[in-house]
Amino acid sequence: MGLKKFLEDIEHHFEPGGKHEKWFALYEAAATLFYTPGLVTKRSSHVRDSVDLKRIMIMVWLAVFPAMFWGMYNAGGQAIAALNHLYSGDQLAAIVAGNWHYWLTEMLGGTMSSDAGWGSKMLLGATYFLPIYATVFIVGGFWEVLFCMVRKHEVNEGFFVTSILFALIVPPTLPLWQAALGITFGVVVAKEVFGGTGRNFLNPALAGRAFLFFAYPAQISGDLVWTAADGYSGATALSQWAQGGAGALINNATGQTITWMDAFIGNIPGSIGEVSTLALMIGAAFIVYMGIASWRIIGGVMIGMILLSTLFNVIGSDTNAMFNMPWHWHLVLGGFAFGMFFMATDPVSASFTNSGKWAYGILIGVMCVLIRVVNPAYPEGMMLAILFANLFAPLFDHVVVERNIKRRLARYGKQ
């Protein structure tokens, strides 16, 4: 018996009146994961397309894989470098024995020595990322299924993307209970309360991270959370620039200066999925080509960022080093690239009119630079900039639609 035949034979048990009716949401999610549903619209207009919401979400999920794999490799590499910088000999062995991430890596064939290869770095990074992702997926999935069962509709595939995006924008050292709490806030408060997928006006992943930032700032920001090494403290490159300009960009674990190419490739501490602009560009090119992400929004974000950062460069400052950060550094530091490619382009919380997308993107770019440069307490600004722009997205669309209506009335109203 083939899989499709098996799913068809048991379908009636999950339909209204069947003995497993309450589990229809789970059955539908599993069935449509493997096969495109044969549903058609009952009224005109009819559009036939095998790419449904689930396929779109899977494409976005696959698009973040380059950043995810590089992030695991980089997280492991940064941790190993920091450990060997702080400890050696018996002291290093004792540290490894006391941390399950370290000894599990060695048990699986890796090494924590300074000559560790890419496999060891990937293994160590995976021991940090995969538990976070699994926690986020299970806890968030529980809330998603619960709301679907209460509302008696199919599981919304939007969480498939929300879960991995959230896991990629947090530090590798985030406690698992906080990861569960953050995704709970994002799914329940920022999405399901407003009706679920397609009705939320805030990006759920960013809303969850913002909740953690304000509720538990010690585990989501500062100098202790970005490198997964016991006893190690090291600021992100963005924080270092804020403190002393380009000359302050030093990788404390290796003692080497951080170049622009290091930041572009992703050889710097940071959130798991945000460090490599190159990997993010690869994924972004795919979803833009597939028509999932709007190039207008991405272009607007770049325009807003370049214009305001250049203006600050011209103004200059002797007391605030962030005034002197060029636009190409803004692009590769912090969460700018990840936010621009995968958060700002969220089709639900972003503007949907073409002109609105430009305004929405420009606002994000401007607000990100403004927060980074002017706010001395918070060097990163992309998260707050996108959430702020989410609030204005409906206004942009309303203005565009009203202007189009007035223009057409003026053109054809008297005929």
Swiss-Prot record:
GO cellular component terms, A-Z: plasma membrane
Keywords in alphabetical order: Cell inner membrane, Cell membrane, Flavoprotein, FMN, Ion transport, Membrane, NAD, Phosphoprotein, Sodium, Sodium transport, Translocase, Transmembrane, Transmembrane helix, Transport, Ubiquinone
Transmembrane intervals: 23-40, 56-76, 129-149, 164-184, 275-295, 297-317, 325-345, 358-378, 381-401
This enzyme's EC code(s): 7.2.1.1
Chain positions found as FMN phosphoryl threonine: T236
Membrane association type: Multi-pass membrane protein
Cofactor(s) essential for the protein: riboflavin; FMN
Stated role: NQR complex catalyzes the reduction of ubiquinone-1 to ubiquinol by two successive reactions, coupled with the transport of Na(+) ions from the cytoplasm to the periplasm. NqrA to NqrE are probably involved in the second step, the conversion of ubisemiquinone to ubiquinol.
Family designation: Belongs to the NqrB/RnfD family.
Subunit comment: Composed of six subunits; NqrA, NqrB, NqrC, NqrD, NqrE and NqrF.
Protein name listed in UniProt: Na(+)-translocating NADH-quinone reductase subunit B
Gene assigned in the entry: nqrB
